[in-house]
Amino acid sequence: MRQKVRKALLIIAMLLFPITMWYFSPYLIIQAASEHTVNGSFIVFVSMFILSIFFGRVWCGYLCPAGGIQECVSMCNDKPAKGGWRYKIKYVIWVLWITGIIVTFILSKGDISIDPFYMTDHGISISQIGAYIVYYGVMLLLVIPSMVHGKRATCHYFCWMAPFMVIGSTIGRVLHIPQIHIEAEKDKCISCGRCNKSCPMGLDVKTMVSECKCHSCTECIQCGACIDECPKDALKYKMKWK
């Protein structure tokens, strides 16, 4: 039942993407910074960071429109995306992007203003036919990596939002702040591999269970698919750290 609800939420988020897209825009935050404006995407990114301290990457697993799009694509390519150095690409992108935002803000002039609906039409992102060119371009950028490389490849390799939540969840874990995370009892594991097959991120959950690393995996989106699939209840949600 939990996975049906989760997937329904992702589909709703995906369908609402033409309305919400500018609130996740990595470009508009730079444009707003050049005008000393705190825009909607700035507020969203800061909120993601703060929430991740207590909820990990739950946003990615339950509410992210880009995640919903990629999980639909996984029906065409359900192979796990390769890891290693590729996972670091998004951090390089993030550092360069954040540096650009900061430099742009410092060099800009004028009083600071707050406009959550910056560059939207009464809060709606895509309201004109011409804007759909941008929308479908973004859709292609989200879809192609997952089509070529496998499960949620865009999340793994290129997502500019993921580092906010990785940093936030890491802070929560290091400081032992109560946080939603997945813990495993490896003695219960029978190495059936069902957790690996069910993971929408294509993670090697079985190995993480054997090495007791489920709680510290920064690529885990706390979706709970592995928990629901495990026949021995070896995986569970926890709030308190051991």
Regions inferred by a protein language model and the residue ranges of each:
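Non-ligating segments of multi-cofactor redox enzymes
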Residues: 1-209, 213, 218-221, 225-242
